[in-house]
């Protein structure tokens, strides 16, 4: 009998509704892709791209909330793309989702109604020793401005870009969107009430000029460390964050 493959684990999100396959060590899914998926204003029939999809967690969470989407995941790391492709089968999405292995600058095609993305978040410092984590966490040949530019380029006119990133990069995000997008909705994500925001979710409309909106923030944890009811509704029940 063939021994079990211990290089990956099969796990669940959204209270068991979503299956993901991911490396047993190195890059592991956190809550960012789940929050990202909850913030995507998708409708059945739309074309959706997840740029840098990793193992597909955000795509699969979005599909669980909004049936009938046409989903594309783009991932440059072949191993993560392989796990994402396995996730397509595990979630019964073979007819509506595809995973493309390649670089955002070279392999992204469109046009898409919505591009969702959780870009590499660190622009400097020492990369993690694990290759999959380094690729997911560190900007490489495409910096944040370039990443956003490529995402906007494959959007339909008036299409929307939705991204999650570290709160301290908000000024860089808004600078990259300037003169190329508007109707920008900014939602801070707080670890606990009274703390500085840890993440921001930014939803921008390509070629729009509507003024920006600062939305109410989401607090993830109560003082005792448990998820707040609002966070629990998203992370376990799969509710939208719109």
Residue ranges and their predicted role:
Residues 119-146, 150-153:
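Mobile active-site "lid"/loop adjacent to the S-adenosyl-L-methionine
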Residues 19, 70, 96-98, 182-185:
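Conserved beta-strand segments of alpha/beta enzyme cores
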Residues 2-42:
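Class I SAM-dependent transferase core
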Residues 36, 118, 147, 204:
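Residue-level signal for inorganic ion chemistry
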Residues 196-242:
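SAM/dcSAM-binding transferase cores
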Residues 39-117, 123-129:
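Conserved SAM/SAH cofactor-binding pocket of Class I
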Residues 25, 142-191, 195-197:
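Conserved Class I SAM-dependent methyltransferase catalytic core
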